[in-house]
């Protein structure tokens, strides 16, 4: 009978420590990115809640009874489709471009109706200007809120809220807002990832994870 195959030798201790360090760094980077994505998605939800009624109101204001639910639906689809395509544009350019494209959807939806070019242009300009102002307002109020009362918290479950609050408040890693928005150099992404990494390596995050699983 042939002897059983030998068990593989365990990795050297130094390699094990290196693997743990790499894994901790990957977890820290992933957690940083996930929380930033949570904040941005929550900001989008807050914006949408105010944006859609605004579009409806301006359609009715400029086109009256012609602005039926069907017309609103076509225009809304055109807007969101264009926003997916021009997300690399600056704020003002993006909204003016979006409503220039959406004007075509209005023309198509109201084909056969008497709609003046002046009304179309007035609607386009009004929508773009109000969308720009709304975006700035939502963004400013979102970033101004302390982490303990961030609008993002209401979109999280009680368990994930614990982890969000730990990173944002106890570790002190805030959402990245950008140097242009702040008007000065912000703490680098690498520095913030390092803070989360240290919380993982030191074991500070362990009670938080236990609380999440309770």
Label each PLM-derived region with a short phrase.
Residues 1-214:
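C-terminal auxiliary extensions adjacent to catalytic cores
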């Amino acid at each position: 009978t042939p002897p059983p195959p030998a068990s593989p030798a365990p990795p050297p201790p130094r390699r094990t420590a290196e693997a743990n360090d790499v894994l901790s760094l990957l977890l820290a980077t992933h957690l940083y990115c996930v929380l930033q994505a949570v904040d941005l998605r929550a900001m989008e939800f807050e914006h949408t809640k105010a944006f859609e009624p605004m579009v409806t109101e301006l359609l009715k204001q400029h086109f009256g009874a012609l602005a039926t639910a069907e017309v609103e639906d076509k225009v809304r689809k055109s807007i969101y489709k264009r926003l997916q395509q021009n997300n690399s544009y600056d704020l003002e350019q993006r909204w003016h471009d979006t409503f220039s494209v959406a004007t075509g959807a209005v023309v198509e939806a109201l084909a056969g109706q008497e709609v003046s070019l002046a009304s179309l242009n007035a609607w386009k300009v009004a929508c773009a200007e109000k969308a720009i102002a709304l975006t700035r307002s939502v963004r400013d109020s979102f970033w101004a809120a302390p982490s303990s009362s961030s609008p993002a918290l209401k979109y999280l479950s009680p368990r994930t809220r614990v982890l969000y609050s730990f990173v944002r408040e106890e570790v002190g890693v805030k959402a990245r807002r950008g140097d242009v928005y702040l008007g000065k150099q912000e703490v680098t992404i690498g520095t913030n990832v390092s803070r989360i990494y240290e919380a993982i390596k030191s074991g500070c995050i362990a009670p938080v994870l236990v609380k999440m699983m309770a």
